[in-house]
């Protein structure tokens, strides 16, 4: 009985010592904007796309219009500002002047001002290392050809985005034309890291093409942070190619709080190959 009394007194003490504690915690800032775009060392009009976030993969993102968008870089002690202009026929797409050309190894900042908010992203423009075009396609059992994605020049390449632009529209009408088309564009990524070879395809369908096809192979060399963005993006999605419309919470970004996506600065190289029988 005495033991029970001790237990009862102990419980009463615990109850009397209860105190309501208001925990302080930081909420993630609201996601206001998705940024998708890059500049290169080509002299051309470069595109930056601004949209509102969506919650479902198949939702169509709403373009963000009326933003003030600029690209900044240092030149000596001065900061040079290059304002972008919103495309009249494509709301939410902002263009540099057609003469704008990035410089290798220079850091570039994207500055966005919209409805009282300001967002910033920074990336370094990497040099694009030359690549070999031999053996980039192989003949299939059906007599047609397909891209040789496992070719060593790609699997062992530096971090880059690659595009195969295939065109055999100049060949006779009797030539192979699936779905009535004689063109295709394929994308893949070489994203080397410590634990994987980092070769990612942008789809699972094999595209066949005939001898005589013209292949324009484009390479965009990317920074380590751009590669990290793509790794996390590919890890979070069932990647089939296309525009990144939905961003998960843990996807890497170089945008300041309130925005996601990526602003990239890339070195660019391209070469043309004609498929020989």
Labelled PLM ranges:
Residues 2-9:
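Sec-dependent signal peptide recognition
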Residues 9-10, 192:
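Enrichment for repetitive, rod-forming helical segments
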Residues 13-16:
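C-terminal motif of bacterial Sec signal peptides marking the signal peptidase cleavage site
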Residues 18-277:
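A sequence/structural signal for flexible, mid-protein segments enriched
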